A protein has these predicted regions:
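Periplasmic c-type cytochrome electron-transfer domains
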Residues: 51-139
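Short alpha-helix boundary/capping motifs
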Residues: 42, 91, 109, 144-145
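Amphipathic alpha-helical substructures
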Residues: 112-173
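Short glycine/threonine-rich turn/loop motifs
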Residues: 1-87, 149-202
């Protein structure tokens, strides 16, 4: 966005903050605690567990290619990554802190004041710049070089089995016996149509 261009300093700072447990009340929970890198920056569990061992109502969404999403959270309640990053800090089930306390901890830190100065030319760290840095990092979480991406660009070939899977994925809903009809909702190249669907599951 126009008010938060990506910079090398901002992305690097955002990555540090994403893995920083100081953002939680007791210093045990970071963004990465639920958005796990090994699982596409998502939580493989049905419900994510927060700072006090409490379970949330949903699990942490995948962040890969999140830069292309205009509505965030499972209910679309956030309009951009900056807006979304405000929420977990003060959520009593997630990180259960206050922005005043988090800002004070970061301002008193041995490294963060200089890093925020380099990224945003500010002398006092506050919530607005914390979420801007995290959002910058999240916009760099891009998967664009998988085998499917390379095939889509005409750079490699898929195996016969993979091509059969692609055909099944793209069979139209009028003939369920012939395939899976995935593509209507999981639309290439991001494998989402960026809308919300009721699939009948709680």
């Amino acid at each position: 966005p126009a008010d938060n261009f990506l910079t090398e300093e901002g992305v690097s700072l955002g990555r540090m903050l994403f893995y920083e447990p100081l953002l939680s009340r007791d210093g045990t929970q970071s963004c990465a605690s639920c958005h796990r890198q090994a699982t596409g920056f998502s939580d493989p569990n049905q419900f994510s567990t927060g700072i006090d061992g409490d379970q949330g109502e949903r699990n942490a969404m995948a962040l890969i290619n999140i830069a292309w999403s205009d509505e965030l959270n499972w209910d679309g309640s956030s309009i951009n990554l900056e807006d979304q990053a405000f929420e977990p800090i003060t959520n009593p089930v997630e990180m259960h802190d206050t922005w005043l306390n988090v800002s004070n901890k970061l301002n008193a830190h041995s490294e963060y004041p200089d890093l925020f100065k380099a990224a945003f030319n500010i002398d006092q760290i506050d919530s607005n710049y914390v979420v801007k840095a995290i959002a910058q990092f999240e916009r760099t979480l891009i998967s664009g070089n998988s085998k499917w991406d390379k095939w889509y660009r005409g750079e490699v070939s898929l195996t016969e089995q993979e091509l059969r899977g692609w055909d099944l994925f793209n069979v139209d809903r009028t003939d369920f016996s012939a395939g899976a009809d995935c593509f209507h909702c999981h639309t290439a190249p991001h494998f989402t149509d960026f809308t919300f669907h009721n699939n009948g599951l709680d």
